[in-house]
Amino acid sequence: MRRGLERTKGALVCAILIAAARFVRAAEPPDPVSVFVPAPVLPDPEVRKNSLLLSGAVLLAVLIVGELTWWRSETTEKFHMKNEGWLGQETYAGGADKVSHLVGGYIVSRELAIGFERIGNSPARSRALATGLTSLAGVLVEAGDGFSVYGFAWEDAVANLAGASLASAITAAKADDLVGLRYGLVHAKIPPPDGRAAAYGSDYSREIYSLDLKLAGLFRRLNADAGPARFLVFSANYGSKGYRFSPAERRERNVGFDVGLNMVEILSAVGVRESTWWGLPLLKFFTYYRLEFTAWGWRYDLNHGRWSGFGTGNRFDPGKVSYR
């Protein structure tokens, strides 16, 4: 269990920082077919050293940020586990926390793979290193949580691994221009946090997570002219509302289907390039961030068995507030 907004913001910042590695020139050995099996030839000592340095820096950063941000003010007497479940109606945040871990793992692993490749690892080895490092970092976060009020949630660690593995699989299939995961914020009526100090955990009512089908990549594979459709994405998304403060009958778990704008494709069309110091972080940001009011569609509330829309996912009546 962790503060979802802080974690996903951290993943976005990490992605932008790691993206700077693209400006480092490095060798690119042949890419084996397998997603995770390393190349048959070991990297030279300099590449191994740099890979260890990058891995150590990431793990050290995880420990420092965890201590300064969460653990030092939320420690308990002993390590303990917590079974949070997955996406069920009675689970923590209605499962939004698990989807947050999935998307965060995807973002960090994808960018770490780029970083490892730029310092000389083969593409396959880079994906393997990124998947392992992202998963290990997730376990370290959960281990720290085990000594806090949150507890060690093995489901969070599995969700991190799933997101990291998904990133590796998509990249190995050379499908990054076709599918991807994003995180976004939507407006939602959230009461002021009076009485919140005694409780803990995130409110996910303003967060939305999407799996995107990018029409530009689809038409490219069909050898067809996409025309203006190349600027669109079809998305399936998930989000929960009210689990932090609303009575049970008001809480929602929404599965949505949207049509939205592909901001990366639009920016590229107007001349934004990864080769510039400002273009790369801008394109990276919109690769992983879903801008509000750029996607519209319908949502199905799993808790109440009803559809809502046409909208952005910002409709919610919190009812009588009672912070937990």
List where the protein language model places each region:
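Residues on the lipid-exposed face of transmembrane beta-strands in outer-membrane beta-barrel proteins
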Residues: S165-L166, Y209-L215, F257-M263, W298, ...
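Interfacial helix-loop-helix junctions of multi-pass membrane proteins
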Residues: V141-L161
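Outer-membrane beta-barrel proteins
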Residues: I114-G120, S168-A173, L213-A224, M263-A269
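Residues that define the transmembrane beta-barrel architecture of outer-membrane proteins
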Residues: D203-Y209, E249-F257
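Bacterial N-terminal signal peptides that target proteins for export
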Residues: R2-L12
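N-terminal targeting leaders of membrane proteins
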Residues: C14-L17, F23-K98, L102-S109, A113-N121, ...
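Transmembrane beta-strands of outer-membrane beta-barrel pores
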Residues: L185-K189, Y238-G242, M263-E265
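Transmembrane beta-strands of outer-membrane beta-barrel proteins
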Residues: V179-L181, R230-A236
